[in-house]
């Protein structure tokens, strides 16, 4: 069973994570008008994962994105 979890983790890190977001440092997040924090507010969206432990890059949502769905 342990090998199954190991393979699942490798698959996630190799295929799924790079397709959804990238690891960025705090300076790159700031250049994209975001901030590295633990949780995004409801008025913000996640754009990347910061290289800092357990932090994500959050930026403000545009009003057009709220009405999209």
Curated annotation (Swiss-Prot):
Its main location: secreted. It comes from the Eukaryota. Disulfide bonds join 29-57, 36-50, 40-58. Expressed in epididymis, predominantly in the caput (at protein level). Keywords: Antibiotic, Antimicrobial, Defensin, Disulfide bond, Secreted, Signal. InterPro entries: Beta_defensin_dom. Residues 1-26 form the signal peptide. It is found in: Secreted. Has a salt-sensitive antimicrobial activity against Gram-negative bacteria, including E.coli, Gram-positive, including S.aureus, and fungi, including C.albicans. Binds to and neutralizes bacterial lipopolysaccharides (LPS), abolishing TNF production by macrophages challenged with LPS. Rescues the LPS-induced reduction of sperm motility in vitro and may protect from LPS-induced lethality. This is Beta-defensin 114. The lineage of its organism: Eukaryota, Metazoa, Chordata, Craniata, Vertebrata.
């Amino acid at each position: 069973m342990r090998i199954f979890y190991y393979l699942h983790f490798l698959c996630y890190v190799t295929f799924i994570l790079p397709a959804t977001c990238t690891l960025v440092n705090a300076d790159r997040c700031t250049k994209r008008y975001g901030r590295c924090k633990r949780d995004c507010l409801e008025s913000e969206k996640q754009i990347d994962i910061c290289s800092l432990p357990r932090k994500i890059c959050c930026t403000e949502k545009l009003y057009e994105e709220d009405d999209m769905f």
